[in-house]
Amino acid sequence: MSESNIIFGKRTVFEALENDVQIDKVYIDRDNQFMENIKRKVHEKSIQISFVPIEKLNRLTKGNHQGIVATISPIKTLDLNSLEKSIIDNNFNFLILDSVTDTKNFGAIVRTAECLGMNGIIISKSGSSPINGETIKSSSGAIFNIPIFKVDHIKDAIFLLKANEIKIVSADEKGENSIYDHKFDRKTSIVMGSEGKGI
C-alpha cells in the first residue's frame, strides 16, 4: 500500500469525510471508545470500516495516527494549463513554493495558505515535498480545500502570472512585516523558498 494513499489522525480523517474525499477504507483501533462522530459519518457515506488492533495501525503508518487510519485515492494535482484557466476565472493570489522538501513544513504552509485565502499553491514536479500522509496530517486537512498546481518548472508559472499582470513578491525570514499584516494588491502572488537555501 502506497504511503501517499494513507491518511491518519482524527482531524485529518474528519476533514477528508467533510470534503467528500474518495475514501476506500477506514481502520479504527478496536479498543477506542470515542470518535463517534467519525464513525457516524463513515456509516452515512457507506465507507468500509474495520476495527483492528493498535498493532495493525502501527504497521499501516509510522505517524501519530491517534487510533484511526484511512486509505484514500491520491490527492489530485493540477497542471500549468489549469493554472491559466484559474487565472482567467479571476484567481490571482497564489503561493509559489521553490524547492520546499520537508513534508511537515509543506503541510503547515498549506494550512497557512488556506487561512490567508490563497487561490492555490504552485510546486514543481521535481525537488518538492511529496504529498503523503504526513503532509496531509500537518495541513490539518487543509490540503483538501486548496488547489495544488504541479508544474515542470517554477519559472514557467511565474512567467504566466507576470504575463497576466500579477505582481510577484517574495517571503523572507528577515522581513520586517508579517505576512498576516501586509496588505497585498488584489493581483499578487508570493514566492517562498526552501528551508535551507531560500529562493
Please provide the spans of the model-predicted regions.
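Active-site/ligand-binding-proximal alpha/beta "capping" segment
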Residues: 169-199
